[in-house]
């Protein structure tokens, strides 16, 4: 692996995963807006409530108490329906966000496991043994090559470096 550009494949995979992870909230919000179109009904209900409140402000409570009370009950009922609708939409958005996150992390884990299995025996790169002397066996795992950097260590380092770079950029 050290001779070719496979290290670049691993690095670009890690970069892409971290980039997608950065935009995950936006992606899940976009998907929830596509799948749940309740916003139009909510807007209708809000405008209807506003109209009824305007009408309520024109009615004298002393002169037309029965009409005033009916309209007030109607407003309260519609407000409760709106709250229920908003609560339902919020729950659906949370569920969509949870599903998108779980799907992403499953795909990311599958990608990382496939990279580890593919490059299990080969070092990603070979450096002088003195550079990594105290941790040489740990860094070389699972390849076991002296002075080699194994795929697991490479993935951990790449994930951390890419995450720090993306955090600094955003």
UniProtKB/Swiss-Prot annotation:
It is found in: Endoplasmic reticulum membrane. GO terms for molecular function: protein-membrane adaptor activity. Residues 1-6, 118-137 are lumenal. Residues 61-91 form a coiled coil. GO terms for cellular component: endoplasmic reticulum; endoplasmic reticulum membrane; GET complex. Residues 28-96, 159-170 are cytoplasmic. GO terms for biological process: heart development; response to auditory stimulus; retina development in camera-type eye; sensory perception of sound; startle response; tail-anchored membrane protein insertion into ER membrane. Keywords: Coiled coil, Endoplasmic reticulum, Membrane, Transmembrane, Transmembrane helix. It is a multi-pass membrane protein. Residues 35-93 are annotated as: Interaction with GET3/TRC40. InterPro entries: Get1, Helix_hairpin_bin_sf. The keyword Transmembrane applies. The chain crosses the membrane at residues 7-27, 97-117, 138-158. Disulfide bonds: none annotated. The keyword Coiled coil applies. Belongs to the WRB/GET1 family. Required for the post-translational delivery of tail-anchored (TA) proteins to the endoplasmic reticulum (ER). Together with CAMLG/GET2, acts as a membrane receptor for soluble GET3/TRC40, which recognizes and selectively binds the transmembrane domain of TA proteins in the cytosol. Required to ensure correct topology and ER insertion of CAMLG. Component of the Golgi to ER traffic (GET) complex, which is composed of GET1/WRB, CAMLG/GET2 and GET3/TRC40. Within the complex, GET1 and CAMLG form a heterotetramer which is stabilized by phosphatidylinositol binding and which binds to the GET3 homodimer. This is Guided entry of tail-anchored proteins factor 1.
């Amino acid at each position: 692996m050290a001779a070719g550009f496979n290290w670049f494949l691993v690095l670009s995979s890690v970069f892409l995963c971290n980039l997608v992870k950065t935009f995950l909230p936006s992606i899940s919000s976009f998907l929830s807006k596509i799948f749940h179109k309740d916003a139009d009904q909510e807007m209708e209900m809000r405008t209807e409530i506003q109209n009824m409140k305007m009408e309520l402000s024109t009615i004298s409570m002393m002169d037309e108490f029965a009409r005033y009370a009916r309209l007030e009950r109607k407003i309260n009922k519609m407000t409760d329906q709106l709250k229920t609708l908003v609560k339902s939409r919020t729950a659906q958005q949370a569920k969509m966000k949870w599903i998108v996150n779980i799907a992403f992390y499953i795909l990311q884990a599958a990608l990382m496991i496939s990279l580890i299995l593919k490059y299990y025996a080969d070092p990603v790169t070979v450096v002088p043994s003195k550079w990594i002397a105290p941790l040489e066996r740990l860094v070389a795992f699972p390849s076991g090559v002296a002075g080699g950097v194994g795929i697991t260590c490479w993935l951990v380092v790449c994930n951390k470096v890419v995450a720090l770079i993306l955090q600094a950029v955003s």
